[in-house]
Amino acid sequence: MKSICRKTLELSATFFLFAIVLDLQAADWPRFLGIHADCKSQETGLLDAWPKEGPPLEWKKVVGTGYSAPSVSNGNLVLHHRIKKEEVVESMDPSTGKTVWTFKYPSNYIDPFGYNNGPRCTPILTQDRCYVLGAEGKLYCIGMQDGREIWMRDTAKDFNIPEAFFGVGSTPLLEDDKLIVMVGGQPDSGVVAFEASTGKTIWENVGKKTWDGERKTGWRGEPFVQWQEYEKQASYASPVAATIHGQRHILCLMRQGLVSLNPDTGKENFHFWFRARVNESVNAMNPVVSGDTILISAAYYRIGSVLLKVAPGGTSVTETWRSRALEIHWTTPVLHEGNLYAFSGRNEPDARFRCVEMATGKLVWDQDESWRKSYLAPPEKYGRGSAILADNKLIVMGEAGQLGLFRPNPGMAEEISKFQVPEMKYPCWTAPVLSNHKLYLRSESRLICYDLKKN
């Protein structure tokens, strides 16, 4: 009895401490797509509408190239960008944008398709550490207080990795004491777990043994996979952790499809083929989990979306629906009260802003956001954008610098406010970041902070 009581007290204390930590971090945005990686913030007290010229500007700053979003935690903002021939990890005061420290290392990355040469992955922040993954696959752990290197792994040298299309762009996942990275190594190092404190390899899995001989589900004739040593594995989606039927899953939307792994051992739970028919294609949307279902989507060559239902044992999935109502390129939908709010379309002329019922795949409403790319004048449309949810409002960043505020309304596309952010132009492909009532927007050359606090 004493043992049971003592255990109960220990669990209660642990829960209490955990609740305190959550409360302290509720206004933070310490990793890609927010504290829970779901494009949502728990903040309230935000402006209900914006002036015509936009909300109050706090500060703005010229930054280097890249698509990496800033992360904010414990009074620190960290941006990963490239200046000339160096990738720079820069810690700033989130209230002013002033530099606190920088950490630099050489980079020779050149994008083969002409996009910018900066980092694509977003920093992960803890109380005392910062983890970054560069465009060439250099993985660093840096001290948050002084910006000094703690450890480094050069994944391109440590693993056999075919060159990625647009550089390394899958932000790692910190799960307990493991840093889980979609490395993309051959033949079976598609996903690698590193010890977060030391950088040592804990486990590696996914590759030839996962896909070789599998049917290419959804392809005409459903041919079998014949694995090649030059197969690219890493996608531009980031690993997602989820608890389904009481079991913890690491969900990785690889270039070939979705794989679920046990976070402790790396053992596969299940996999599902999901890839466009042509080589020049990518998967870039993070999986979205609701209950025992998982949504995956892509925009290349009519692949569309699939909702998968996980079996109670957690070792298999079945298709619930397959639809082209959402064809998502590089953004991740916001799930709110059973509906998905997202930008659909591969290219600028295909762009739509849509609401889709997650359980059925039914298109609820559709708004045309298509435009023809031009550098002469900013478009009035959002194009392909990103959205986050806070205070029952959707904050939308269009790819040419249009910033919008929407009500998440399944009845209609209810736009509250909209304005063109000065000095931001195409391509604005970085999702907005919200922390302590401050909105941070990043383009290829600017970092801008707005105050969204309601007076």
Predicted regions and their residues:
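Bacterial N-terminal signal peptides that target proteins for export
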Residues: 1-13
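Short N-terminal alpha-helical targeting/association segments
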Residues: 2, 15-17, 187
